[in-house]
UniProtKB/Swiss-Prot annotation:
It comes from Haemophilus influenzae (strain PittEE). Displays ATPase and GTPase activities. Pfam families: PapZ_C (PF22740), RapZ-like_N (PF03668). Keywords: ATP-binding, GTP-binding, Nucleotide-binding. SUPFAM superfamilies: P-loop containing nucleoside triphosphate hydrolases. InterPro entries: P-loop_NTPase (IPR027417), RapZ-like (IPR005337), RapZ-like_N (IPR053930), RapZ_C (IPR053931). The keyword Translocase does not apply. This is Nucleotide-binding protein CGSHiEE_06315. ATP binds at G8, R9, S10, G11, A12, G13, K14, S15.
Amino acid sequence: MEIIIISGRSGAGKSVALRALEDTGYYCVDNIPLDLLPQLTDILSQSQSSVAISLDIRNIPNSAHSLKQTLSTLQKHHQIKIIFLEADRATLIRRYSDSRRLHPLSLKDLSLEAAIDEEYRYLEPLIQHANLILDTTHLSTHSLAERLREFLRGNSEKELKIIVESFGFKYGIPLDADYVFDVRFLPNPHWDPTLRPMTGLEAPVAEFLNSHTEVNEFIYLTRHYIDTWLPMLEKNNRSYLTIAIGCTGGKHRSVYIAQQLGEYFQAKGKTVKIQHKSLERNKKIIKSAVIKTLFLLTALFLHAHRLYNFTRITA
């Protein structure tokens, strides 16, 4: 029997994930103590072929040894996959504030911030066993469901999906990255006033970086490193490999290099998704600022219009 265990930080999207799996045909069980899983799976295996089980902090044993023992017992008889959902601290705080729900560990008289930090410490042993760590910080419910469907399709096809992403260190390291490469030591187009407004996807920035031997050497050596270990990673029953390339702001160097690496592996016939996290983040910020500006201008126009009409009437 195939068993998908959904766990992760409270507020990271476990309920959404479980509903998405239910929609794809999995028999779903929410929040059962881990110690009862062997008995539950024995019963379900008589009538079900695919089961998804959600575990939260309240149902995971305190002992890392007990956790490992229970998972080992299950893996002897079933195909187990563990999906761990993650999100950054600020996002979790905002989600709890929006939902007005209590964090499970808040019952221990902890503040929300302290409860979030304490929960992560409890969950660390489970993270070590995860087949997929999914950062939901910037994912909508629909995007999360789609990533899970991609993961499940990857399981059935036994095909490794490669995600190459650029990011800015000033915004934080992506939590779902398997490999992180720091390119902040490479020549920076930011210091050229003509290149500063551009991104690593634009030709002048690409030409600038391509003209430096150290940039080309870094790309070559990174490609060689991944090429060397990719066959073993593919044999290791993984569904995703996330490679993160970081520079200071995630605008020039990391974008160019991530694009080069992604296109290289695409040309080799691999399934590759290229994404630029900081560029996408800045687009959302600009879009939000534009909407707010338009809203403010509309409000000012309406106010001026009313004031004009009032002045004309009273004149």
